Structure formats: structure tokens, C-alpha cells
Curated annotation (Swiss-Prot):
Signal peptide: 1-19
Keywords: Oxidoreductase, Peroxidase, Secreted, Selenocysteine, Signal
Matching CDD domains: GSH_Peroxidase
Subcellular localization(s) per the UniProt record: Secreted
Annotated source species: Homo sapiens
Pfam families reported for this sequence: GSHPx
Known tissue expression: Expressed in olfactory epithelium and embryos.
Uppermost EC category: oxidoreductase
Annotated GO MF terms: glutathione peroxidase activity
Annotated GO CC locations: extracellular region
Protein name in UniProt: Glutathione peroxidase 6
Domain of life assignment: Eukaryota
Chemical reaction(s) catalysed: 2 glutathione + H2O2 = glutathione disulfide + 2 H2O
Length: 221
């Protein structure tokens, strides 16, 4: 399976880079709703190897970045950038959590046991190993979506008015607050309440700048 995707990765990265040049800045980030009821601490998820169920309440007091990911997406170039973000912001209490999903273009086709191998040898390849926590592959939209994503989506406006081509979207029913594509991001504050939501093509450098600006209110050094 890995050989099947390897040749296409560089092409995908090139196309995504071109698309980002035309992305309107005002669409890159939205602030989440005020007066949200509930927190992420009511939820949890199984790690990628299925050996541990992590309750998100263990991240109380931290700033948590939720990302839905896919190894064979053109945006997989964000993986090493997310590694760098995790390393650079960990002393600020920022934690990255990644959730593989196959609902957008069928770009995460592997089993849980194959995902890390795909990241290491194919996309992004070059021996890549994530420094942040990955969870089991699952849905972020539709009838079987993970409950934490139901909460995140209900807490924040969508980043775009358009859902995209239905031929590349694999869930039902479709709703206005659904995640649009791989690598959308939600920042949750130290009280467990969502703060910001980024469009999937927003550069990780922009996400980092937005987070650093947000952290100023906490006088974090």
C-alpha cells in the first residue's frame, strides 16, 4: 500500500502550497461561541495502539489543539510542522492531539497499525515520527462521529460556507457545522472550553502566531 501512495505525495504537497497562496486570510480562523455549555473534560479517546483510553480531563489547565489528520492528504506536510509547534509551545502548556479520519477523499485508508508506518515511510516520510498523541482512526462527522467532535463543532462556527464536493465527502447526514476537510484545528482553553477554530489550509505558522497572541492574556513566559 505504501508504494501506491509514495509517488503522489510530492504532487499533493505542491498543489496544496499553490492553493494556500490564494487563500483569503479572513477565512483562516474563527473565534468560538461565547457561553458554551460543557467542556472537553466530559470526553476521551483510545490511543492509536488501542492500549489506553485517555480522558481529556487530564489536560485541565492546558491549552489543547485538536486536529483531524490523514496521512495521504496533500496537507500531510503539516505533520512535521505540528511536531515543531508542539516542541516550541510545550513550555506554554500547549498540547497537540491528532485524530486520523478517512472521511475526506478516503485519504486515511490504513488500519490503526499501519498509520505510523505510513507517516514514517510515505507521507510525510523520511523517518517521520509524531511527537504528539495520535488516537484511533474514527469519524469526525456524521452519524458515528466522535462525541468530542460533536462538542467542538457545536461550540464554534464553521470556517467556510461551503462543504465541498460531495463525491469526496463520506458521511451522512451532512450538517452546516461539519468539518470541511483534513487538518482543521480547534484550540481549547485551560478551562476545557473551545476558543478558536482554523480552516484546514491555514498555515501552521499562522496557527502558532494566533496561539501565541492568545497566550499573552495568561502572562505565560
Amino acid at each position: 500500500m505504501f508504494q501506491q501512495f509514495q509517488a503522489s505525495c510530492l504532487v499533493l504537497f505542491f498543489l496544496v502550497g499553490f492553493a494556500q497562496q490564494t487563500l483569503k486570510p479572513q477565512n483562516r480562523k474563527v473565534d468560538c461561541n461565547k457561553g458554551v455549555t460543557g467542556t472537553i473534560y466530559e470526553y476521551g479517546a483510545l490511543t492509536l495502539n488501542g492500549e489506553e483510553y485517555i480522558q481529556f480531563k487530564q489536560f485541565a489547565g492546558k491549552h489543547v489543539l485538536f486536529v483531524n489528520v490523514a496521512a495521504y492528504u496533500g496537507l500531510a506536510a503539516q505533520y512535521p510542522e505540528l511536531n515543531a509547534l508542539q516542541e516550541e509551545l510545550k513550555n506554554f502548556g500547549v498540547i497537540v492531539l491528532a485524530f486520523p479520519c478517512n472521511q475526506f477523499g478516503k485519504q486515511e485508508p490504513g488500519t490503526n497499525s499501519e498509520i505510523l508506518l505510513g507517516l514514517k515511510y510515505v507521507c510525510p516520510g523520511s523517518g517521520f515520527v509524531p511527537s504528539f498523541q495520535l488516537f484511533e482512526k474514527g469519524d469526525v462527522n456524521g452519524e458515528k462521529e466522535q462525541k468530542v467532535f460533536t462538542f467542538l463543532k457545536n461550540s464554534c462556527p464553521p470556517t467556510s460556507d461551503l462543504l465541498g464536493s460531495s463525491s469526496q465527502l463520506f458521511w451522512e447526514p451532512m450538517k452546516v457545522h461539519d468539518i470541511r476537510w483534513n487538518f482543521e484545528k480547534f484550540l481549547v482553553g485551560p478551562d476545557g472550553v473551545p476558543v478558536m477554530h482554523w480552516f484546514h489550509q491555514a498555515p501552521v505558522s499562522t496557527v502558532k502566531s494566533d496561539i501565541l497572541e492568545y497566550l499573552k492574556q495568561f502572562n505565560t513566559h
